[in-house]
Design a protein with these regions (language model features):
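N-terminal subdomain of nucleotide-sugar transferases
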Residues: 1-4, 48, 73-78, 141, ...
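A conserved catalytic-core segment of Leloir-type glycosyltransferases
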Residues: 1-52, 245
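Short N-terminal targeting/anchoring amphipathic segment
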Residues: 43-63, 78-84
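Donor nucleotide-sugar binding/catalytic pocket of nucleotide-sugar-dependent glycosyltransferases
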Residues: 88, 103-183, 194
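Conserved donor-binding/catalytic core segment of Leloir-type glycosyltransferases
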Residues: 146, 170, 191-210, 216-220
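Short hydrophobic "strand-cap" motifs at the C-terminus of beta-strands
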Residues: 148, 171-174, 201-204, 230-232, ...
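Glycosyltransferase donor-sugar binding loop
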Residues: 202-206, 216, 225-240
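Nucleotide-activated donor-binding/catalytic signature segment of Leloir-type glycosyltransferases, i.e.
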Residues: 231-256
Length: 259
């Protein structure tokens, strides 16, 4: 549904997202479709004439990256990219750590992660995709690359794309201290049956790349502590007895109580 807030713009449609996802899987190229949706977005950007465009996650089957970047480059619009993952600096991977792949630091190809994230059914286009991204961002008039941690920023610096950036720096995820403040710990401990020392992890969906394996190892090595994992976990995964699972929640208050 289109947002009621006039300051928000809804890109494309649900049908376009599904079609983009299908074409991406067939072609092996993510971010090369949604022509009409991107054309309409460009018209909107032309209308509001922003001082800067801030890019976040664009690998959700809804944007044509070459079309968007050509417009921004031609109009010399400054671009900020925040790295919530590493899709912008790889052929297709969001998380290269799962396969310990470092090819993206020079040139992708023969990708070990074709089934990760936006999977491809037939073709490995990662070499072409990274070349395209490098060329696109080399033409950006003013480019800032922002990592959400020091580690992420250090990894971004290893990319060929970083040499075209005017700024590469970390800006850490902020915490709303009006919501996250010391709470009554007894309430949460009683609710979930937590005794003694605890460790907590939060993820919308748990997987190896989100650290699930590390939390399981921690629980096995330290059976005297309680590990609380908030988020969805595959039912087929066997967990140690000292791991407590809490379903995903959109309640800030519930998360704050657990923290």
């Amino acid at each position: 549904n289109k947002p009621d807030d006039p300051n928000l713009y809804h890109i494309g449609s649900a049908l376009d997202v599904k079609l983009h996802g299908l074409l991406s899987r067939i072609s092996g190229k993510q971010g090369y479709f949604s022509h009409l949706a991107t054309r309409n977005l460009v018209k909107y950007i032309e209308k509001i004439k922003p001082d800067v465009v801030h890019l976040h996650n664009l690998h959700g089957n809804y944007i044509n990256l070459p079309m968007l970047m050509k417009y921004l480059d031609d109009k010399k619009v400054p671009v900020v990219i925040t790295f919530h993952d590493f899709w912008f600096i790889t052929g297709k991977c969001m998380y290269f750590t799962t396969s310990n792949c470092e090819k993206w630091q020079e040139q992708c190809g023969n990708c070990p992660n074709l089934q990760d994230g936006n999977r491809t059914w037939f073709f490995d286009k990662t070499e072409e995709l990274l070349k395209d991204k490098t060329q696109m961002f080399s033409k950006t008039d003013k480019l800032a690359l922002v990592g959400v941690s020091k580690w992420a920023t250090d990894e971004v610096c290893k990319s060929p794309i970083a040499r075209y950036a005017d700024i590469v720096k970390p800006i850490y995820n902020w915490v709303d201290i009006s919501k996250f403040y010391p709470r009554d710990i007894k309430k949460a401990r009683d609710k979930y049956g937590i005794n003694g020392f605890m460790a907590i992890g939060v993820s919308s969906i748990w997987s190896e790349r989100k650290g699930l394996k590390s939390f399981i190892e921690l629980a096995e090595k330290m059976p005297e502590i309680t590990v609380v994992l908030v988020g969805t976990i595959n039912e087929g995964i066997e967990l140690p007895k000292n791991i407590i699972t809490v379903p995903s929640t959109s309640s800030i208050d519930e998360l704050a109580e657990l923290y």
